[in-house]
Amino acid sequence: MDYFPVISVDLQSGRRVVSVEYFRGDGPPRIPYSMVGPCCVFLMHHRPSHEVRLRFSDFYNVGEFPYRVGLGDFASNVAPPPAKPFQRLIDLIGHMTLSDFTRFPNLKEAISWPLGEPSLAFFDLSSTRVHRNDDIRRDQIATLAMRSCKITNDLEDSFVGLHRMIATEAILRGIDLCLLPGFDLMYEVAHVQCVRLLQAAKEDISNAVVPNSALIVLMEESLMLRSSLPSMMGRNNWIPVIPPIPDVEMESEEESDDDGFVEVD
């Protein structure tokens, strides 16, 4: 049996929120399709290709889509990355809570890409310590891809768009693109988020009265990478997020009836 995607759009707080849910079918699709990890993707704008290439972009740049991508009970048509330098950090972050990051303005901004709001979902899906079955993973992967690209009706273009977003942000941050071939898009988003967090952490560390577990882990990882793999830190061009200055309520002075004059008997 195969699982096919159903896309739904809800109106929440005045904005359109897309979700993808997979349902069991009664056989293989009757139209061209691909598998991105556990996700079946119907192909309407790209030709399926059985060739093996180094990068996802080697396919969609010529109007094609790899027949199989990523991990699964199949051979991927996109080659895996040569290394996963941030797997340890991803596993550590996978056990933290969102509030560990959102209390600091720069860390919050770092994990707000690519969704436009802070999320640890990509770390959860990429952690080797968090295990979910494919029934849950396929819904989450497809939903995250569509929400990241702000596309509400096309899963195929969402996966292409997400890899384009990863490549664009990687170039901005000074990340080697060979580490982000499009083999595992959820991991690759988490990889870019790690670099963003490491670049952002130095801003929040200088302002933190007492560093929490998230800042401590990021400080330790930063020190280790600077001594062993400094290129993994990227270009270090983070634009600081300045925390807002809290409003200070001033006591209003009572108005004087005598306008500053003192009566003398």
Swiss-Prot record:
Mutagenesis / variant outcome for changing R88A: No effect on filament formation
One GO MF term: protein serine/threonine kinase inhibitor activity
Phenotype when changing E221A: No effect on filament formation
Example of a GO biological process term: symbiont-mediated suppression of host innate immune response
Pfam family, one: NSs
Role description: Plays a role in the escape of host innate immune response by promoting the degradation of host EIF2AK2/PKR and inhibiting host transcription. Cytoplasmic NSs interacts with host FBXW11 to degrade PKR whereas nuclear pool binds to host FBXO3 to target TFIIH subunit GTF2H1 for proteasomal degradation with the help of the linker protein SKP1. Removes FBXO3 isoform 1 from the nucleus. Forms nuclear amyloid-like filaments of about 12 nm in width that may sequester NSs binding partners, causing cell cycle arrest. Also aggragates in the cytosol as short fibrils late after host cell infection.
Name of protein: Non-structural protein S
Protein source organism: Rift valley fever virus (strain ZH-548 M12) (RVFV)
Top-level taxonomy: Viruses, Riboviria, Orthornavirae, Negarnaviricota, Polyploviricotina
